[in-house]
């Protein structure tokens, strides 16, 4: 097998020749199995039971986004008012989920839906969904200045 001296010189030059050097540290792997077992033990202490026939779950956030769980596992302990949702959430906009979430919307989210419908009818792209919230919502909250107590602010 013939050896090309140019390629050999190039490879030797590219190879890092270090004697001694620093040790390459292995990255610590965060194991979630331990966290999962702790969670399972905590739910076991609360006597949580698996809730069947839950196909999906949606959590509406204050910023107008929705955490959507397509396949979700739900465990609940009604006595301690504790419920655990397990699965992989996807962050989506309300506009992406409108056909699926109409039956799930409560009274607090109907205002957001109305604003969204108005924006779509006006031909505008949906902007921030909470933009229509009352701007003066903090009228009764006084501004604090450094060194003052909240009771003394007029």
Curated annotation (Swiss-Prot):
GO terms for biological process: protein transport. Residues 33-98 form the NAC-A/B domain. InterPro entries: BTF3, NAC_A/B_dom_sf, Nas_poly-pep-assoc_cplx_dom. Keywords: Cytoplasm, Nucleus, Protein transport, Repressor, Transcription, Transcription regulation, Transport. It is found in: Cytoplasm; Nucleus. Belongs to the NAC-beta family. This is Nascent polypeptide-associated complex subunit beta. The lineage of its organism: Eukaryota, Fungi, Dikarya, Ascomycota, Saccharomycotina. The gene is EGD1.
């Amino acid at each position: 097998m013939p050896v090309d001296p140019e390629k050999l010189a190039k490879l030797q030059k590219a190879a890092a020749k270090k004697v001694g050097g620093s040790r390459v540290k292995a990255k610590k792997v965060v194991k979630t199995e331990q966290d999962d077992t702790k969670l399972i033990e905590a739910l076991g202490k609360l006597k949580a039971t698996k809730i069947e026939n839950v196909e999906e779950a949606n959590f509406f956030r204050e910023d107008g986004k929705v955490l959507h769980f397509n396949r979700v596992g739900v465990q609940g302990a009604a006595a301690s008012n504790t419920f655990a949702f397990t699965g992989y959430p996807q962050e989506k906009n309300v506009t992406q989920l409108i056909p699926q979430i109409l039956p799930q919307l409560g009274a607090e989210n109907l205002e957001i839906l109305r604003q969204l419908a108005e924006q779509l009818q006006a031909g505008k792209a949906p902007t921030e969904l909470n933009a229509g919230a009352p701007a003066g919502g903090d009228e009764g909250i006084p501004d604090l200045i450094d060194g003052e107590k909240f009771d003394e602010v007029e």
